[in-house]
Structures are given as structure tokens and as C-alpha cells.
Amino acid sequence: MSDTIVIVDAGRTAIGTFGGALSALQATDIGTTVLKALIERTGIAPEQVSEVILGQVLTAGCGQNPARQTTLMAGLPHTVPAMTINKVCGSGLKAVHLAMQAVACGDAEIVIAGGQESMSQSSHVLPRSREGQRMGDWPMKDTMIVDGLWDAFNQCHMGVTAENIAKKYAFTREAQDAFAAASQQKAEAAIQSGRFADEIIPVSIPQRKGDPLVFDTDEFPRPGTTAETLGRLRPAFDKQGTVTAGNASGINDGAAMVVVMKESKAKELGLTPMARLVAFSSAGVDPAIMGTGPIPASTDCLKKAGWAPADLDLVEANEAFAAQAMSVNQEMGWDLSKVNVNGGAIAIGHPIGASGARVLVTLLYEMQKRDAKKGLATLCIGGGQGVALAVERL
């Protein structure tokens, strides 16, 4: 790579709950807010953008290429191409990797990458409807479950894969609830202190009467959560299990994006890089324990960067489930005081196509606040994969 690849700006929406503040908006509406804001505040001429690459997992019934829709809705000219990708929970981070590759290869100068998702607006579908059903029940399928939360290989919910990890590592219910409570408490403290304010781009939501609602605060965290309150919840996937709605991530809506270019281009445009993109890795694992994906992905990413876990100043590791996140922390052996310092997806939420970019955006802003040098963003992926991205502040 002859010229350093950098991120010059990053932003995300506040994360909405399932059926919550953002539920009336399509994923493209949510993404448009972020894309438009990044163009405006960087001062980049819309026609200068080489491509827009966005992750979105739940696209059934959303129309052709949602990333393209978002691009044009944000006011970019029709000459700017766009691509929607689906790597399930890793989509938003893989989009950034694709941007990194395109810029490094000289195929693009400026790429805006990230993800968008409305789990609230995901469709129900009627399989085999073109053939018809002569007799019997004809059940619809929930695409949010089938396309987003279901293991196609073992025919089970993602929560069952978390149960598999809990059993493999002998993680108790109490330990998982304590982990989840800590995530909630860190997120609550971060929100109360305005820690996320810089990274959040407000969304204006039209109302039937009066002024639009301005949504600018994550609504999924549950203030006052303790391990004791979580301990009252029933297991969600196995009656004898340990995984509950309280020690798992949420079903959420949101969008997050970053602006990628070469350092020389940033200098030409008078933009100050937030960080350089150092290394990326994807890895595959047994789908039955898909949550362990960040272990080989992070290990390989650090190897490419020439770093050790101890070199990291901050880590954002997506919390799909407490058991899953605990397994990653245990195997990576990194300093837990540097991991998800403002809470993770158990508290903040997990809008699947956007989460990869969300953890990266949060990482970048927290690195600025702490004057941190080296950071890592990583996520597990349904179907048995992991992704990781190493960044360094210049």
C-alpha cells in the first residue's frame, strides 16, 4: 500500500428499539440521514464520491439495492454507484473493508461505507406462493428470524448457538447476567455523561401533528439494570438453559457509516484523519458455536497488523450474547478494562446490518477522547464467521 488509507469522518444514528422511535422509517430513510450528514460536514462534493457500500441484511421487500436508494435519497448524483452487501452481523464492517480495498487498489478515491437496518420493518413472506397450496395450513415466515437470526445449517436460533458456547465454556447463568448488567451499567453511565453525543447524528422523525421528533439518544439501554433483576428472567431458547433476553443483544434499528480515502486525498481536501485502517481479517468457525468467530478473526487481524492483544488501547467487540462475548474475552486474553468501555450490544442494541459500522464508529470516537493509539473492532457472524478491523490514530 503506497499511501495510508484513512477514515476522515464517522457517524451513526442513535439505536432504536424494536417497534420504537425509528420503527416508522425504512432502513433507507435511516441510512439517508447519516450519509447526508457525512457529506455535509466533510464538505465533500457529492459527485466526488466514488462509491457507497452499505451492509443490510433484511432486504426482502425493500426494493432493488437499498444502498443505491440511500445514495440517491441523500442527494448524491445518479453517477455515484452503490452496492448493498450481506455478511449478516459483519456486513457493516465488511463494507469498510471493501472500501479500504477499493481505495488501496486505486479503483476508488472516496468511498462511504457502513450499514443500515430496520429490523422493525422486516417483512413476513409466504413461501411457495407462486405454486399455491391445495390443502392444509400455509404458514408465513418471518424474514427477521429466517434471514437474520436463524442458523441455516443446524436449523436453530442464534440463541441456541450461545447456549452451546455457555455449555462448552461452563459459563454459569450468574456469570452471564453479571456480564450483561455491567454492559447496561456502562452504557447508562455513558449516556448520562453525554459520551455518545459526538458520534450520534440526530434523526428527524415526522409526526402526525406538530414538529418532527428529534431522535438522538440510544433507547435500548435499560437504566437501573442489575444482575439481580436479570436473574428473574426465564431462559429464552432452552428451558434448562442460561441464555435470556436480558443477557443477549437486542432487535434494533439504526445506521452507521464512515468516509474512507487515502491520506494524501484527505490532505488535498483539508480533512483531518480520525485513524488509519491497518488490517482486516475474516474467519470461519463451526456454525454451532458461531459466536467464537471473533477469536480467529481478531488473532489473524492482529498478526497482519504486527500487534499483540496487549498492544491494544481499546477494543469494541460486539456483544451478540453474554456467553459469546465472554468466550471471546477469555480466549483473546486482552485487558477487559479496555473492552466495550461504554457498554456493548447487550445494552446499546444490535441492528444487524449496521452493527459492524456501529462498533467501529464508537471505537473511533472513544479513541479520540482517550487519546488512544491502537484499536480493534470485531464481531461474530451468524452461520459461523467472524470479522475484525485494526485501526490506528495518526
UniProtKB/Swiss-Prot annotation:
It catalyses: 2 acetyl-CoA = acetoacetyl-CoA + CoA. Pathway: Biopolymer metabolism; poly-(R)-3-hydroxybutanoate biosynthesis; Metabolic intermediate biosynthesis; (R)-mevalonate biosynthesis; (R)-mevalonate from acetyl-CoA: step 1/3. GO terms for molecular function: acetyl-CoA C-acetyltransferase activity. Its EC number is 2.3.1.9. The keyword NAD does not apply. Belongs to the thiolase-like superfamily. Thiolase family. This is Acetyl-CoA acetyltransferase. It comes from Thiocystis violacea. The lineage of its organism: Bacteria, Pseudomonadati, Pseudomonadota, Gammaproteobacteria, Chromatiales.
